[in-house]
UniProtKB/Swiss-Prot annotation:
Superkingdom of the source species: Eukaryota
The organism of origin for this protein: Homo sapiens
Record keyword Nucleotidyltransferase present: no
Assembly and interaction partners: Homooligomer. Heterodimer with ARL6IP5. Interacts with ARL6. Interacts with TMEM33. Interacts with ATL1.
CDD domains per record: Arl6IP1 (cd22559)
Tissue: Expressed in all hematopoietic cell lineages, but the highest level of expression is found in early myeloid progenitor cells. Expressed in brain, bone marrow, thymus and lung. Expressed at low level in liver, kidney and spleen. Not detected in heart.
Designated name of the protein: ADP-ribosylation factor-like protein 6-interacting protein 1
GO BP annotations listed: apoptotic process; cotranslational protein targeting to membrane; endoplasmic reticulum tubular network formation; endoplasmic reticulum tubular network membrane organization; negative regulation of apoptotic process; positive regulation of L-glutamate import across plasma membrane; regulation of endoplasmic reticulum tubular network organization
Similarity comment text for this entry: Belongs to the ARL6ip family.
TM segment ranges: 42-62, 66-86, 134-175
Length: 203
């Protein structure tokens, strides 16, 4: 068991080191984005919502076709991939990195690797469910996809995408400041109260 844990830890460290090397040119930008997403300043949340709202208003105004939208998005990614590693050191000064910044960059890369592992793990579990319990897999997929299709039919595509993107960008800050845990705790307490009241009525 210990040998398996050590192997997993070593593999995680190797994957993290590899990702750090790949993203080295993006280090300064990632550190800045990390600060924004974790709401290190009070005005970061409204700034996130403002920028996202502006981007989606532009998309709504231009109303591009799917092909044009995808092409522009990929073109933007290509430009960013080319320009960011060149411009970031000149703007931020990568030679001025502190030990704390280097450690935070390592933590970000480690979290990205762990997130990727979780996603792969869930994907593998899905296929395991398909092999072991095909009926349950079939029913789960049909119900889930039908629910998603119904939501997509009720809500405008652009509005739904806006809500998803905004929620994902606000999620790290909500988690960092304990807001998610706070409301989960409140929901659990309310559920427990309802269950206790039901038990008293049954008695």
């Amino acid at each position: 068991m210990a040998e398996g844990d050590n192997r997993s830890t070593n593999l995680l460290a190797a994957e993290t080191a590899s990702l750090e090397e790949q993203l080295q040119g993006w280090g300064e930008v990632m550190l800045m984005a990390d600060k924004v997403l974790r709401w290190e300043r009070a005005w970061f949340p409204p700034a996130i919502m403002g920028v996202v709202s502006l981007v989606f208003l532009i998309i709504y105004y231009l109303d591009p076709s799917v092909l044009s939208g995808v092409s522009c998005f990929v073109m933007f990614l290509c430009l960013a991939d080319y320009l960011v590693p060149i411009l970031a050191p000149r703007i931020f000064g990568s030679n001025k990195w502190t030990t704390e910044q280097q450690q935070r960059f390592h933590e970000i890369c480690s979290n990205l690797v762990k997130t990727r592992r979780r996603a792969v793990g869930w994907w593998k579990r899905l296929f395991t469910l398909k092999e072991e319990k095909p009926k349950m897999y079939f029913m789960t997929m049909i119900v889930s996809l039908a629910a998603v299709a119904w939501v997509g039919q009720q809500v405008h595509n652009l509005l739904l995408t806006y809500l998803i993107v905004t929620s994902l960008l606000l999620l790290p800050g909500l988690n960092q400041h304990g807001i998610i845990l706070k409301y989960i705790g409140m929901a659990k307490r309310e559920i427990n109260k309802l269950l206790k009241q039901k038990e008293k009525k049954n008695e």
